[in-house]
Amino acid sequence: MGYDFKVKLTGERERVEDLFEYEGCKVGRGTYGHVYKAKRKDGKDDRDYALKQIEGTGISMSACREIALLRELKHPNVISLQKVFLSHADRKVWLLFDYAEHDLWHIIKFHRASKANKKPLQLPRGMVKSLLYQILDGIHYLHANWVLHRDLKPANILVMGEGPERGRVKIADMGFARLSNSPLKPLADLDPVVVTFWYRAPELLLGARHYTKAIDIWAIGCIFAELLTSEPIFHCRQEDIKTSNPYHHDQLDRIFNVMGFPADKDWEDIKKMPEHSTLMKDFRRNTYTNCSLIKYMEKHKVKPDSKAFHLLQKLLTMDPIRRITSEQAMQDPYFLEEPLPTSDVFAGCQIPYPKREFLTEEEPEDKADKKNQQQQQGNNHTNGAGHTGNPDNSHAQGPPLKKVRVVPPTATSSGLIMTSDYQRSNPHAAYQNPGPSTSLPQSSMGYSSTSQQPPQYSHQTHRY
């Protein structure tokens, strides 16, 4: 390569510092690098972006796989990778994503903390339904293209703030995503342990090697239950989180304490699970005779004859073969009764959740949140938006007012071109137009905790 050509190439290469203003707008940091809230310097648009600087120099093969996959995924409910920058001078890699102001981890935490008040703020029924429908829509797109997400949890479900996509769900963190149409090896051989413990399907905990899209459906069921109750349904103490052994006694015990021990007729293939002998040695069926999902949800005031409960049962079916698919779930009667799902999960109402705050260069990570993050997942992952977030370990903490973060980035995914255009499979549950937004304007660059506090929800109208 000639010198003149190198000079010309360097001059033509886009530099992230020339295109975006992000100094002093750091919203996250971790072992993966740093994340900034950014705006274009040329003013071509007024959008907010998430700009992630990957730690270290150059780009790893795992990051290449993730980027290759992200560049092929195009769906309204999947986070969008806008651009990749490579700084020639210091060999730093920058990823540009859509910026999401909120995520389910902090939304649920906000409502959970309100339970200490005399008038707790429950997630409105319409908002829960819209969130679930959009999650299913995004996952159906991934599954239709043979992509398993493999790490669904509230921290990886982003929600857009004020702007053109207000209230739209974005599934993020494709770090563990894998193509499943024709793997050369069992997926369990590629990654022995996937999915954060609380959202891990029972077949994974029992060592399944050829797991399927059903693992994502189980995780969605866990998220749905958490939206309905503001509590993680299968919360348990985290131990030995770095082990490569998928079997986890405490997590299985928590599942059985909620669901009951699976009957042979309800999960015939459980005997084929690699860890079945360990399961039968460690557990006694009669210990969980009085445990059932009905009893658990009734404690949280979810009626067993409601359509919401019936759908939850289908999502949390123990046998992965009998577990409902994303397409079937989108066609469930739950989505056909009022209130219908909307494209803006806030349904045009004022958003009550605090915005993210900026971090100073010297500001340490919040110790409590950092401890929770380490307990929940042992290491950091990459989410699509490049934000940092906390798994839902500390389910008794108050609402996030300081150092709010969404999920950290890693990269361990396979990337191949998607094979088919995606069509919405459920015309009967199309989003409803919520009408003009009645929310108050918010600063486009604000991360302060001075966002207006919400009025009490009206439990009749389910509005803020």
Curated annotation (Swiss-Prot):
Keywords: Activator, ATP-binding, Kinase, Nucleotide-binding, Nucleus, Repressor, Serine/threonine-protein kinase, Transcription, Transcription regulation, Transferase
PANTHER family: CELL DIVISION PROTEIN KINASE, CYCLIN-DEPENDENT KINASE 8
Cofactor(s) listed in the protein's UniProt record: Mg(2+)
GO cellular component, one term: nucleus
Subunit structure: Component of the Mediator complex. Interacts with ccnc.
Keyword Repressor: yes
Name this protein carries in UniProt: Cyclin-dependent kinase 8
